[in-house]
Amino acid sequence: MEENGAHEKRWIILGIMSLSLVIVMLNNVTLNVALPEMSKDLKADNSDLQWIVDSYALIFGGMLLVMGALGDRFGRKKALQLGLVLLGTASAAAAFYADSSNDVIIARAAMGFGAALVMPATLSIVIVVFPREERGKAIGIWTMMAGIGAPIGLLVGGWAVENYDWQMVFLINVPIILLALILGLVFVPNSKEDKRTPLDPIGAFLSVAALGTILYAIIEAPSLGWTSPEILAIGALAIVMSYLFVNWEKGIEYPMLPIGFFKFKGFSLGLIAIMLASFVMFSFMFTQML
């Protein structure tokens, strides 16, 4: 560790965090190019294919806040390594053992859980190992790697399907994840919160419930209809859970998500822009690959 608190191998660590982040982001999109082959091989209909794609996003998005908070409390390196192991194991299981759409959906859900451990841990580790004066540049590089993960995923997925089969889309994850695991074990330092703040189990439950119901409604609405009773009920539940989550986080001393962040216009507008761009990009890719 240098005098200013910076880790002497921080740029190597940033490279490892970037690689880990790319693994998370490319798994959002690699499968899209394999959907036609999977539809034939697994006899999957459009609803099955949508769940194969979205089970990853549902668990990933629903568990992201909780896994980030647990990683900060119990150890960011542990969270990173555990998440990569889950991603690699689920990828191998899908490649070698999945023979139905349900098998792939379960594997993708497990991958989403692993990704929810990895992504927040990578950012937290970057923040810890870089001094304040270099932190903005490091986070900018981290953000850039998140952005290029999707196009890399399309290229990798296209190559795998063109030259092999849809199973290779999963199998290709394994050596990349092994590389990230080994490099992480060697170079990434252990870190966690210095001050043991109380856990927020109620906030964790409400965040998972709110994000899960929102994502479920968005996933199922195209097939069930936006005005169907089920979607309206789930949408209403999502609003209630979101309201309860926000009010709970406002009222406790150590919130899992400080609501005050949303008062900053740049933060809020940036989130809205990312959300809209993601909706457009992933909707386009899903419909065009079928």
Give the ranges of each region predicted by the language model.
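Flexible interhelical linker loops that connect adjacent transmembrane helices
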Residues: 2-4, 181-208, 250-265
